[in-house]
Amino acid sequence: MSKSSKLCRKTSCPRSNIFCNLIDKIVKRPSLQFLGQWGYHCYEPRIYRTLAKILRYVDLDGFDILLSDYIAFVEKSGYRFELNFNLEFTEICVNTILYWVFARKGNPDFVELLLKKTKDYVQDRSCNLALIWRTFTPVYCPSPLSGITPLLYVAQTRQSNILKILLQYGILEREKNPINIVITILLYPSRVRIMVDHELVDIQEDAKTCLVLCSRVLSAISIREIETQLSLGRRPIISNWLDYIPSTRYKDPCELSHLCRITIRAQLLTNNMLPNGIFSLQIPXRLQKYLNLES
C-alpha cells in the first residue's frame, strides 16, 4: 500500500469538490506524504492560499458552492484520514472560511448564507459543520485553538448589522452566559476598529444599536455585573450606556409582550426553526417582525 493510501482512502468523492481536490494535491506531494510526522505547519499554507484565493473574490453564488462542497466533504466524501490529520485539515479550513467571512469581508449576506447552509447542525456544538460555534483567529494564524467564536468577534467589533442576523438565528439565546456578550459590546477596547476620529463615532453608534438588539433577546441584563467591571477601572465605549438598556431588563417588571416573544422564540429555537419558522405563524406581519427582533 502506498504512503498516500495509508493516509487516506477514497471511496466516493466528486472530483469537482474543492476540498477533495485540495486533499489530493496535498497527499500527492512527496514532501507531505508523512503528514502526521511533519504537522499542520507543512501543509497549512497551501490550504490557506487555495481557500483565500477563492474567498477573496467570491460572490454569494460561489460561496454557496464552497459551503456545499465543505458539507459534502465532511458528510459524504468517503475519505478516511488519520485522526490527527482529519482534525487539523478541517480546523484549518474552518478557520480560513470564518476569518474571511467575518474579519475580512464582514458582509451580512455572506453571514446569513453561512447560517442558512449550516443551521441543521447548529444544535450540536461538537459537529464540524456547526461553523458558527467554531473558533477562528481574527488576525489570521494557522491554529485557531486560541481563537474566538464569530459571535464574540462581532461583539468585540460592534458590527450591529451582522449581530442582528446572528441574534435572529437564535445564537445569543444559545449562549450559556449571554451577559458576557453585552459586557464585551460595552467594554471591549475600541482599538479593534478605531483608526480615525469619525470611526469612533461610528463604533459608538453601532455599540448603542448592539445593546438595543441584545435587549430584544434577553429577559434580564445584570447591571451589577457591568458595574463590577466598571469598578475595576474598565471604561465603557459609550458613557450613557444605561439609556440603551430598558429598565424592564434590570429594574422594572418585564413587559408581557416581550415575555411572549421570548417564549415563542424559545419554542421555535428548540425545533431549530429560527428565524424562518416565525413567518409560518398565522399572526399579523407586525407581530412577525416583532418576533424577528425588528422592533
Curated annotation (Swiss-Prot):
SMART domains: SOCS_box (SM00969)
Limits of the SOCS box domain: 232-295
GO terms classed as biological process: intracellular signal transduction; protein ubiquitination
InterPro entries, per the entry: Ankyrin_rpt-contain_sf, ASB17, SOCS_box, SOCS_box-like_dom_sf
ANK repeats: 146-176
Pathway field: Protein modification; protein ubiquitination
Keywords: ANK repeat, Ubl conjugation pathway
Pfam families: SOCS_box (PF07525)
PROSITE patterns in the record: SOCS (PS50225)
Task performed by this protein: May be a substrate-recognition component of a SCF-like ECS (Elongin-Cullin-SOCS-box protein) E3 ubiquitin-protein ligase complex which mediates the ubiquitination and subsequent proteasomal degradation of target proteins.
UniProt xrefs under PANTHER family: ANKYRIN REPEAT AND SOCS BOX PROTEIN 17
Domain notes: The SOCS box domain mediates the interaction with the Elongin BC complex, an adapter module in different E3 ubiquitin-protein ligase complexes.
Family (UniProt): Belongs to the ankyrin SOCS box (ASB) family.
Protein's name according to its UniProt entry: Ankyrin repeat and SOCS box protein 17
Organism: Canis lupus familiaris
Gene name in the database record: ASB17
